C-alpha cells in the first residue's frame, strides 16, 4: 500500500503501476466528507485521475489518510471473506470463511458483498489466526481477501475490527455469532475446546437471483449456486416472513429493484468496454 497525507497530492510515489485502487482509511470520518464525484472506493487508471481524486478529497472535510493500493485483477468471485472471534485471552476460537460472488456496484456501496457462498480454507484461517494472536486481538474481526490469479496467492486487503455488514452469511451457514460473545463475556460459559471452523453449506444473498446467475462466468460455480437455490439453502436477511409492517415488507422489493437496475447497467457497461478492447 501507499498512503497520501501530504500537502501536494501530485508528490505521491507509488511502488506499483497503474491502474490503482484508492479509498479512505477511515470510513467513519469519510462519511461527513462532501465533494463532487465522491465514491466509497476509486478505481483510477492513471496519474492524472489520481491527482484529481486526491485534490477533490483534500478540498473536503475529510482529514484522515487516503490509501492507494495495487490493483489485483479478477472479478468479484475472486474475493474471499473471513469472520473470526478471539476470546478475552486473545485466542482465536471461531472462524467462518466464504467466497464472495457479487459485490454492490453503487458508488457508495462498492466492496460490500451482495452474495457469499460458504467455504473452508484452513490455510487462510491459520494465517489470520497467527496475526490476531500475535497482537493479542480480542473480539470479532472481518478480513477482506482476494485470490490473485497471477500466482494463486491470497492478498489480505484489510481487517475490520468488527463484524462485517454481511455477517449474516455466518448465520446462514448455521452459526450464531452472538453466542460467542455472550458466552465469553456476558454469561461466562466455557467455549468449545480448540478452534471451531464453520463448515455449513449456504448461499447468503441480497441480490436478485437473475442478476447473480448472470454475473457468474464460471460454469461450475454457477451450477453450484443453482444447486443451493434448488436445495433451499439460500438465505436473504431482508426477507423476514414474520414481519408485520407493510413498509418493511415492501423494502426488500424496492432494494432488489434498485440492485437490479444498478447491476444491470454496470454489467452492460463493463461488457461493452471488454468487447471494445478485443
Task: List PLM regions with ranges.
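Phosphate-binding site of ATP-dependent enzymes
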Residues: 5-7, 44-106, 119-126, 147, ...
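Oxyanion-binding "anion nests"
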Residues: 106-110, 118-143
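Glycine-rich phosphate-binding loop of ATP-grasp-fold ATP-dependent ligases
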Residues: 19-53, 79-81, 103-116
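Flexible, glycine/charged-enriched surface loops at secondary-structure junctions
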Residues: 67, 138-142, 191-197
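Acidic/histidine-enriched active-site and ligand-binding environments that engage anionic O-linkages
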Residues: 12-21, 92
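Conserved metal-phosphate-binding beta-hairpin within the catalytic cores
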Residues: 133-168
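Glycine-rich phosphate/pyrophosphate-binding beta-alpha loops
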Residues: 29, 101-105, 109-113, 160-174
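Peripheral (often C-terminal) accessory segments that flank ATP-dependent C-N-forming ligase machineries
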Residues: 182-278
